[in-house]
Amino acid sequence: MILIIYAHPYPQHSHANKRMLEQARTLDGVEIRSLYQLYPDFNIDVAAEQQALARARLIIWQHPMQWYSVPPLLKLWMDKVLAHGWAYGHGGTALRDKDLMWAVTTGGGESHFAIGAYPGFDVLSQPLQATALYCGLNWLPPFAMHCTFVCDDETLQAQARHYKQRLLAWQEANHG
């Protein structure tokens, strides 16, 4: 099962993430947990989130990039749900050998994230990758959709279909 942990503070204004989720929903075996819809008060049901993670074989952290990081509710979710003794540390093996993919949308172009004036994706992904590895997760190559503020609908749809193809390829390679 693919579990998408979706964190968009303003989903009603989303163009790219909305299309990505629409494409993901067309696949069997995909569960989407929209954190800002589930927890508008930021009071996370840790047990429910851990149960969802336990069912998953591929976990996706999907969100718009905000200040080169994750939205605040996703960070809180990580702090609470990825608990010592459950996700890491003594007895913390619940996530071991599951796959994790970071699916992120950006307003900037792909060239903005090339090494140069701003940090590249290799640098920006390090905290997430370190978290994944610390929890025993297999870090998969990220999926990034760039220029989402200026892309036309056709481009957004094409990129969202590419996202679906990544998920489908994972399902085929991992038998669901």
Curated annotation (Swiss-Prot):
Binding locations of FMN: 8, 14-17, 65-68, 105-108
Cofactor: FMN
GO biological process terms on file: positive regulation of potassium ion transmembrane transport; potassium ion transport
Gene Ontology molecular function: electron transfer activity; FMN binding; NADH:ubiquinone reductase (non-electrogenic) activity; NADPH dehydrogenase (quinone) activity
GO cellular component, one term: plasma membrane
Membrane topology: Peripheral membrane protein
Pfam families registered for this protein in UniProt: Flavodoxin_2
Catalytic activity entry: a quinone + NADH + H(+) = a quinol + NAD(+); a quinone + NADPH + H(+) = a quinol + NADP(+)
Protein's UniProt keywords contain NAD: yes
EC identifiers of the protein: 1.6.5.2
Record localization: Cell inner membrane
NCBIfam families: PRK00871.1
Family membership: Belongs to the NAD(P)H dehydrogenase (quinone) family. KefF subfamily.
Protein name: Glutathione-regulated potassium-efflux system ancillary protein KefF
Taxonomic classification: Bacteria, Pseudomonadati, Pseudomonadota, Gammaproteobacteria, Enterobacterales
Gene that produces this protein: kefF
